[in-house]
């Protein structure tokens, strides 16, 4: 059985990152879109990133941000992976010069395979419940039966928590799951018990 990878997104505090790593998370997401409630300054993210143990990936999230800002953040944080959550064109994504994944707004895109075909350079696709122009981390979910078979890894997001992630994995068979609000006590503030329960549910 293939192991389902786990990404905790919206990390803003070193203590949350350390707890997540101790629990066995595979990747941590840092949001660099200023309008997000989970925005983190690049210097703060860099300090957290420097203390990550081996084999825990740092993911930088952007949503229709200015290319100069993206380049600035990448130069400071040096993320392992960049996640584009908006309406960025494939050329804009590739310009960052690092491996990248593209979010798919499932509330707006019916033909996911056709949308994904426009992003041939993506390392994978993150399927989230939001509509185009909306941010992730809303706690909403979508119909998991809509997850298509793609030629690259699929990361499942949107409304996941310890109570439903096992069912989501069984139904959608994603490469990875991504959670933010489902492990929080407030936006950007992670809850250790919820993190622990989420990882236990995935591994179980």
List each model region and its residues.
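Conserved N-terminal beta1-alpha1 strand-loop-helix module at the mouth
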Residues: 1-204
């Amino acid at each position: 059985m293939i192991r389902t990878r786990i990404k905790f997104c919206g990390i803003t505090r070193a203590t949350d990152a350390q707890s997540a790593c101790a629990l066995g998370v595979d990747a941590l997401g840092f949001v660099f879109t200023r309008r997000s409630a989970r925005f983190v300054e690049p210097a703060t993210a860099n300090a957290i990133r420097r203390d990550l143990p081996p084999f825990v990936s740092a993911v930088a999230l952007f949503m229709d941000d200015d290319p100069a800002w993206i380049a600035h953040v990448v130069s400071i944080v040096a993320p392992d992976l960049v996640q584009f959550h908006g309406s960025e064109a494939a050329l804009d994504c590739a310009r960052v010069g690092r491996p990248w994944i593209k979010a798919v707004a499932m509330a707006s895109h019916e033909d996911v395979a056709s949308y994904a075909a426009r992003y041939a350079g993506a390392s994978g696709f993150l399927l989230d419940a939001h509509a185009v122009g909306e941010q992730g981390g809303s706690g909403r979910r979508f119909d998991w039966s809509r997850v298509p078979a793609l030629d690259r890894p699929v990361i499942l997001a949107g409304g996941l928590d310890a109570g439903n992630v096992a069912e989501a994995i069984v139904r959608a068979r994603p490469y990875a799951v991504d959670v933010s609000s489902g492990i929080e006590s407030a936006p950007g503030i992670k809850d250790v018990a919820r993190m622990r329960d989420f990882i236990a549910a995935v591994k179980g």
